[in-house]
């Protein structure tokens, strides 16, 4: 019996595949709470699928290395809100879904500029980031060293602290906020885009590179990551190119 799944999986006729490199102008900031209680509260407030809640809480705690914090770190956590990056044995990373959200956010903003109806929904259904983990990379010194294992940042390059203010039932409160960041860095990821042009309201047809770069031109000013209201996360698109695929019979 022929395995049809093997025959049609990764059908090269359905999607076009691109690679993209974004170089951050200054820094990218982490936005995931590092204290255990904060991790639980953050996930419970943001996860819609409650059936997966406990597993996600456990996985996030592990990837944030909360069990390996020093006594000094724990003392800092007790008196501050500390946001950082997820990490594994390869280095620190942002998630592919964050980049997907960036594209959707920009689509929602520029939909009227491009005269595309339901642009956010169209991007959500057509543009996919292939990687689950997008590692934060050091500056490239030589071409073609992207896969060098030493090219990934293992930890943030710094952190800064500031005051945050909020209104509660007990009145206005202030707390110390600590944010991890990486400067002098870039990311590279793979985009899979449905192979069709978008049709505007006035019947113009936008090819994939055109509408993707419109999204990027807005996103690079809006930023990626946390603390964007403070001017962090702005970037420049250093490379955007199609990966040629060979069709198999």
Regions found by a protein language model. Give the residues of each.
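RNA-interacting cores
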Residues: 1-249
């Amino acid at each position: 019996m022929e395995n049809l799944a093997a025959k049609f999986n990764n059908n090269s006729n359905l999607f076009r595949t691109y690679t993209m490199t974004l170089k951050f102008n200054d820094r990218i900031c982490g936005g995931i709470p590092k204290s255990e209680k904060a991790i639980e509260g953050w996930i419970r407030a943001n996860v819609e699928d409650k059936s997966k809640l406990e597993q996600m809480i456990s996985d996030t705690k592990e990837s944030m290395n909360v069990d390996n914090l020093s006594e000094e770190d724990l003392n800092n956590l007790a008196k501050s809100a500390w946001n950082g990056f997820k990490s594994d044995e390869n280095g620190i990373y942002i998630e592919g879904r964050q980049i997907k959200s960036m594209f959707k956010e920009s689509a929602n903003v520029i939909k009227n500029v491009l005269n595309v109806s339901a642009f956010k929904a169209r991007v959500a259904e057509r543009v996919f980031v292939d990687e689950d983990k997008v590692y934060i990379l050091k500056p490239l010194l030589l071409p073609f060293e992207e896969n060098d294992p030493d090219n990934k940042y293992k930890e943030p390059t710094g952190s800064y602290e500031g005051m945050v203010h909020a209104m509660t039932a007990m009145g206005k409160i202030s707390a110390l906020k600590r944010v991890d960041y990486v400067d002098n860095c870039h990311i590279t990821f793979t985009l899979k885009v449905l192979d069709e042009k978008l049709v505007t309201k006035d019947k113009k047809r936008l090819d994939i590179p055109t509408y993707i770069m419109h999204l990027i031109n807005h996103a690079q000013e809006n930023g990626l990551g946390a603390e964007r209201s403070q001017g962090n996360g702005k970037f420049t698109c250093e490379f955007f190119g199609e990966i040629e695929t060979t069709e198999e019979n």
